[in-house]
Amino acid sequence: LTSTTYVDICSGDISHNYKELFNLTVSLKAKLQKDDKRKETMKLDIVKNRFIFLALSAILLLPGIAAMIYSTITYPTHTPLKVGIDYTGGTTLQYGVKEAISNDKLSDVRQALEKGGIDNPYLQIINVNSQQNTELKSILSIRTKFIEEGSADQDKITNIIDSEFTSPQLVQVSSVGPTLGMELFKNSMIALSLALLGIVAYLTIRFQFDYALAAILGLVHDALFVCGIFSILGLLYDVQIDALFVTALLTVIGFSVHDTIVVFDRVRENLKYYSKKMTFGEIMNASINQTLARSINTSLTTLITLLALYFLGGVTTRDFVLAMILGIAIGTYSSIFFCSTLVDIWEDKKKSDKAAAV
């Protein structure tokens, strides 16, 4: 409120200052409501328990990291995850059968194929919609090393399937050459690298490098968790990754960094108004609590949709959906409890270094 406005008010001449007074009143009221709301939303003390959350992250990641190390040592491909034919090259043969295939029957077929000289076959059951096909009950998908169509190896597989089932039908044969598989793998890694570089550049420009580094570590945290779970599933249930898995990882990275940016943006906004009244830890706590409901609600609505797809969708997209479910769940956790605590630790260290220098 300027001195001129004050004199005009006292003299009764306020007509030309009406708009200014109205704006000041609305601004003051909004600020007071904002302050009250921010005080009310402070519920969780994330900063106080930051080392507990970091320890929890380590507990979540260690089993998966151990599985990836073991897989790298033991797999013929020397990869931390069991890779499918999209990356190694290979052939998929699909046989339609007139009976439902149990897990025990699947195990018997796998043993028969291995005894017949087919190394490391990957078997998958695809249920057939009765409305689409009245004769076939299931489709048995067999992935193996690259074989030529009509070759002796394909005939060998067909003969084994003929001996295990009644009148099976070869419905589809598809192959990916080793060169194309390596090209797909290289392109996938380039896509991941470009995504990470773009995120670092954007966050550094919009915030500062500390925030960008925390966000990238959060993304590494999320990717390690998802890859670790799939490494364990590969060891226990022969789950293989393909191009859809990398697509899921890229989607998870985008979703997770979006959640992290929402928190960091609120921190930046609160620092403008409360940096002299509150410590950085208090501002971080307030910012997390103000965005907590939004983050959880957004993730829950997405997870409900993904769970419906997982249980009701087709088997061919199930691993993709599972990777999305795991990634969004851990991404929500990391944006709230992991990235924010890293920034707070670095801010404390900067403050300590500055005090020591003085």
Question: For the regions a protein language model found, what residue spans apply to each?
Answer:
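A structural signal for conserved, well-ordered secondary-structure elements
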Residues: 1-4, 13, 17-358
